[in-house]
């Protein structure tokens, strides 16, 4: 289920509303097919370098083989290094060394279930998250995302600020409705920065102390707006130097960037390159 920005539609806090921290991880749906546990991205790409996670979920799927878990591959200690998680989980033929590194750094954080087939519970969110909390064991690699009930816009704002202070990228507001396998107003993003995709069409070298590294990408959005977009958090001097050395691997690629807001003229305030959009 994809989320709309919270600003798109007013929230009725007289209804049951729940809030979770928004993770800056990699979407992961895990299910069991014919006794084989598989994990997928939101576009259906299989994640193959998370055997440690699937092993820990074996007992759960032995008991609930028809349940589909929804969450993210994430590690809060790597919250400023999104690229590291991607580089680990996207391996299609991981070496033993890469499997070991993934087992040390990659966790599954569950925030919902897509299907509760065969389980006698209702489909409202409060019932789904209650099932998760009661049925999913907390192990080394399995985490349950904290979920709180909020009763007002002020309460939501206070909790959102707490999530930001804890290092999360924002918050998610959920209505107490059934799961929707599409972008839905049942799920709202509550964050200060927005994500968007654009195409890398050029670049500028770094200057001064950043000489010999990438200064910024030149990107073009789907409306034809061009803008400079320097790499954001998580990229060190060595990373920026490697980007410049391999710049032709980036030109023409779709990429995700973050920005604070758009001006009346349509330009982006504080755009930052996040990652290439080639991992799903």
What are the functions of these language-model segments?
Residues 2-3, 8-15, 198-203:
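Short Pro/Gly-enriched beta-strand edge/turn motifs at strand-loop
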Residues 2-9, 87-96, 150-157:
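Short, motif-level signal for alpha-helix interfacial/capping segments enriched in acidic residues
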Residues 11-138, 279:
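Covalent nucleotidyltransferase
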Residues 18-20, 26-71, 180-280:
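Classical nucleotidyltransferase
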Residues 71-73, 110-117, 146-149, 175-177, ...:
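Short, structured patches in soluble enzyme cores that scaffold and shape functional sites
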Residues 142-144:
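N-terminal, charged amphipathic alpha-helical interaction modules
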Residues 146-194:
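Amphipathic alpha-helical
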